[in-house]
From Swiss-Prot:
Gene name of the record: nanE
GO cellular component: cytosol
Protein name, as recorded: Putative N-acetylmannosamine-6-phosphate 2-epimerase
Isomerase in keyword set: yes
Alphabetical GO biological process terms: carbohydrate metabolic process; N-acetylmannosamine catabolic process; N-acetylneuraminate catabolic process
Originating species: Proteus mirabilis (strain HI4320)
């Protein structure tokens, strides 16, 4: 719990930004040294933690920063839609590489390893756990199991059209039940991040708007094209 206390203090002093340093897959930025540099820059600018995907990226980042790292492994499985840290050996690899917090998919979907087993393995290795959830019931289930952090990460990403705005209602509902909520997913502007905190988030994770240059360039390009069409 010492880490949680330290993070809580840092959040109170610095504002509660967690930066997800996950470049677009196979892009020019998708290299461990660049991911590590992103993480360093984020910490220098006041991030209280970073979220890192992949063992090589984590190993490159760990020696360079002293804030907590939320570690994940993403996989594309042939028989399950679950992508985030689906296996027990993923947890072992993340712990060995220096993750302080290990995040896993906490959704109620077909999976190779039950959520409870993933959580127990994280704790067995002396790490804190974060469950990336999509719904209130999923979040509460993980919270009641003893998961330290509940992320709204998967809201909008388990089927159907992806919403444009964050799920603030989910953040509020979970926070009101005593969950330590990390708001994540479509917090693409400072104002939306602030609204996440207002909704009850313990911290807010921002990814694409900070570390996926291609996405941000596309947002600007689309806005300019839209204006050009209006001016015709």
């Amino acid at each position: 719990m010492a880490l949680i206390e330290k993070m809580t203090k840092d959040i109170q002093q610095k504002g509660g930004l967690i930066v997800s340093c996950q470049p677009v897959d196979n892009s020019p930025m998708d290299k461990p040294d660049i991911v590590a540099a992103m993480a360093q820059a984020a910490v220098n600018a006041g991030a209280v933690a970073v979220r890192i995907e992949g063992i090589d990226n984590l190993k490159a980042t760990r020696p360079l920063i002293d804030v907590p790292i939320i570690g994940i492994v993403k996989r594309d499985l042939p028989d399950s839609p679950v992508r985030i840290t689906p296996w027990l050996n993923d947890i072992e690899a993340l712990a060995a590489a220096g993750a302080d917090i290990i995040a896993f998919d906490g959704t109620d979907r077909l999976r190779p390893v039950p959520v409870k087993a993933l959580l127990e393995h994280v704790h067995r290795l002396g790490k804190l756990a974060m469950a990336d959830c999509a719904t209130f019931n999923e979040g509460m289930y993980c919270h009641q199991l003893g998961t330290e952090f509940i992320g709204s990460t998967m809201s909008g990403y388990t089927g159907g059209e992806i919403p444009k705005l964050p799920d603030l209602q989910l953040v509020t509902a979970l926070a009101e039940q005593g969950c330590r909520v990390i708001a994540e997913g479509r917090y693409n502007t400072p104002m939306m991040a602030a609204r996440g905190m207002q909704a009850g988030a313990w911290a807010v994770t921002v990814g694409s708007a900070l570390t996926r240059l291609e996405h941000v360039c596309e947002w600007f390009t689309q806005a300019l094209k839209w204006q050009q069409e209006l001016d015709k």
